[in-house]
């Protein structure tokens, strides 16, 4: 054979690969079947790549025969071999593809895999399924010839600290005319995978819809095809069963569960294309990784083009599946993918179909939709500020936890609104428990006004878009003024907690606090939000909500503006400020205490914790809090 380097070389695995291999070699996962599913999936990808590259270079297909995958079990010795005549790999590609993991989110993946009771689904999701073969093999030998190349290389490893890369032997080079041969030397407890019925069972369950022939090569007799080798998405819905779709989902998504939603249709007209999409029932571990993109595969006339074409908007990135176009050109470059008007039309139409299917599911199968919302609601809500065209539909689909204690739609909220209530109230925070104890809810709760409790990271952003639903604007209880005067309290006959004569004089108290706090706050106001707490902090009437301001400040994307301090004129602490006996030092301590306890209730620390503790001690010792 011809090669530029005839010497073998031992190389260490990348640290992340070594960690992953350690998990595989000492695997306690029960779903060891996935190793074969993953090897077949990789072989199918290699055949897809060959078919795509041969469009520009037809000579690549001249040697090696028609595309296929072969599985060869041999009991003496105990080896299982998976062969494809796909694109193959050269020396550097073997090193890069089998010795490193060039993916974002690797650290998060390994952490979750370590913690998982059964990591099979995670392995498939992350696309590192080759290493799953070490669950059943104590040594793996990979021989590969890249299509059109004269060089053949062998990669081998026992799953330890490294691997060996060397020119293939003459015998191996003669076997591998094009593509890749993977020989697994099975562990004693994995001998069952040499049985034909076990191989057929796994192929039937996970790989039947691989669109290339999968052949079982017995020790005696002729190879026989053991899969249907059809593009399921090109078949009519009437031909397919729920089980067919479940198997296709497991193959496409690398999953073990069943899909929460399936969308399959063919579009005809100005453009013709087939669509098969699945919504998983569980959340992928890397859903919020910054580099994560959509997982929809683009085919053109059954030729795989790319899985990186942004075929759906980012807020639908949890979907898995296939779009197969009859009209797009086969030679699509990355630039053409980004700017192709036909692809933009497909994206728009498919997005509309997905939203329509979610609406139908929410109406006809609310329990199935609830599973999707539970897993992917925070992602779908990204569309509320990304997709103006479909914002109203997405708002109607959204489910919210409220002070009523249940998941509600905005339609249900509006139906239950109090007489004279004109706004949809919400509060953003980091947990339901903390929101329920937030003092800004007090006046609304006293009137039986339902409030949306929003705790997803995206909530502070989409709510900043001045949205309305059914003509009712969404109103934050952390921003601007609120007016509940036209909505009576639930116990309307009960007098206010404090009669007017016991309330502090508004002008006097506000002047004292402003003088003490100076520029630490933008304003001091009497509150309509509070009934029992002394104070709270809110944002001004213009600009971002207070929670969004805090988030942006934590991310160093701008300093939070000075908040408005609202005070409860009926609270003893506030009334103490109006006491003529209070000297300036006491008034300053009380003013700062109102600000600092509001900061604590808002999830922040006082600017100077030591000073806060000092003034609190002074006030307690003087008895001002108890007797003011």
From Swiss-Prot:
UniProt KW Chaperone keyword: yes
InterPro entries: HATPase_C_sf, HSP90_C, Hsp90_fam, Hsp90_N, Ribosomal_Su5_D2-typ_SF
Function of the protein: Molecular chaperone. Has ATPase activity.
Location of the region described as C in the Swiss-Prot/TrEMBL record: 551-628
Protein name: Chaperone protein HtpG
Keywords: ATP-binding, Chaperone, Cytoplasm, Nucleotide-binding, Stress response
Protein family: Belongs to the heat shock protein 90 family.
Species name: Rhodopseudomonas palustris (strain BisB5)
Subunit structure: Homodimer.
């Amino acid at each position: 054979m011809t090669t530029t380097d005839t010497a073998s070389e031992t190389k260490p695995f990348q640290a992340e690969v070594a960690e992953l291999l350690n998990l595989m070699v000492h695997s306690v996962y029960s779903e060891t079947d996935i190793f074969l599913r993953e090897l077949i999936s990789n072989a199918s990808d290699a055949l897809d790549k060959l078919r795509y590259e041969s469009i520009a270079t037809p000579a690549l297909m001249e040697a090696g025969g028609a595309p296929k995958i072969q599985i060869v079990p041999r009991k003496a010795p105990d080896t299982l071999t998976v062969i494809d005549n796909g694109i193959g790999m050269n020396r550097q590609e073997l090193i890069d593809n089998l010795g490193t993991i060039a993916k974002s989110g690797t650290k998060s993946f390994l952490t979750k895999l370590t913690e998982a009771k059964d990591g099979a689904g995670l392995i498939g999701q992350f696309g590192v399924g080759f290493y799953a073969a070490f669950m059943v093999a104590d040594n793996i030998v990979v021989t590969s010839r890249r299509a059109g190349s004269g060089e053949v290389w062998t990669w081998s490893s026992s799953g330890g600290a490294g691997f060996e890369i060397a020119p293939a032997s003459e015998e191996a080079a003669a076997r591998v005319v094009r593509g890749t041969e993977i020989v697994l030397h099975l562990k004693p407890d994995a001998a069952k995978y040499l049985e034909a019925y076990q191989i057929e069972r796994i192929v039937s369950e996970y790989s039947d819809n691989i669109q290339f022939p999968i052949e079982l090569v017995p020790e005696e007799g002729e190879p026989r095809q053991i899969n249907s080798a059809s593009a399921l998405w090109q078949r009519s819905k009437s031909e397919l069963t729920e089980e067919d779709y479940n198997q296709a989902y497991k193959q496409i998504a690398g999953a073990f569960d069943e899909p929460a939603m399936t969308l399959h249709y063919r579009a005809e007209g100005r453009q013709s294309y087939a669509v098969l999409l699945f919504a998983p029932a569980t959340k992928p571990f890397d859903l919020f990784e910054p580099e994560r993109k959509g997982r929809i595969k683009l085919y053109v006339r059954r030729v795989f083009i790319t899985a990186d074409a942004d075929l759906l908007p980012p807020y639908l990135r949890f979907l898995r599946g296939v779009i197969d176009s009859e009209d797009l050109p086969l030679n699509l470059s990355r630039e053409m993918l980004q700017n192709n008007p036909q692809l933009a039309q497909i994206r728009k139409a498919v997005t509309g179909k997905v939203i329509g299917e979610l609406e139908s599911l929410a109406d006809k199968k609310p329990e199935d939709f609830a599973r999707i919302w539970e897993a992917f609601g925070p992602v779908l809500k990204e569309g509320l500020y990304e997709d103006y065209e479909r914002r109203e539909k997405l708002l109607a689909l959204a489910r919210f936890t409220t002070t009523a204690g249940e998941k509600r739609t905005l339609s249900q909220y509006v139906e239950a609104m109090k007489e004279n209530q004109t706004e949809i109230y919400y509060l953003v925070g980091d947990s339901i428990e903390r929101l329920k104890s937030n003092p800004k809810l007090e006046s609304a709760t006293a009137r039986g006004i339902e409030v949306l409790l929003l705790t997803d990271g995206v909530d502070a952003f989409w709510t900043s878009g001045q949205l309305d639903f059914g003509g009712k604007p969404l109103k934050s209880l952390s921003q601007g003024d609120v007016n509940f005067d036209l909505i009576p309290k639930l116990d309307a006959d009960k007098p206010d907690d404090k009669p007017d004569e016991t309330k502090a004089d508004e002008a006097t108290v506000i002047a004292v606090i402003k003088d003490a706090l100076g520029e630490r706050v933008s304003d001091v106001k009497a509150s309509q939000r509070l009934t029992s707490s002394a104070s709270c902090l809110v944002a001004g009437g213009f600009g971002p909500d207070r929670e969004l301001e805090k988030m942006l400040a934590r991310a160093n994307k701008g300093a939070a503006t000075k908040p408005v301090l609202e005070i409860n004129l009926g609270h003893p602490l506030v009334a103490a400020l109006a006491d003529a006996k209070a000297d300036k030092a006491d008034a300053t301590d009380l003013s700062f205490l109102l600000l600092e306890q509001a900061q604590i209730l808002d999830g922040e620390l006082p600017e100077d914790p030591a000073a806060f503790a000092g003034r609190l001690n002074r006030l307690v010792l003087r008895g001002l809090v108890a007797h003011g």
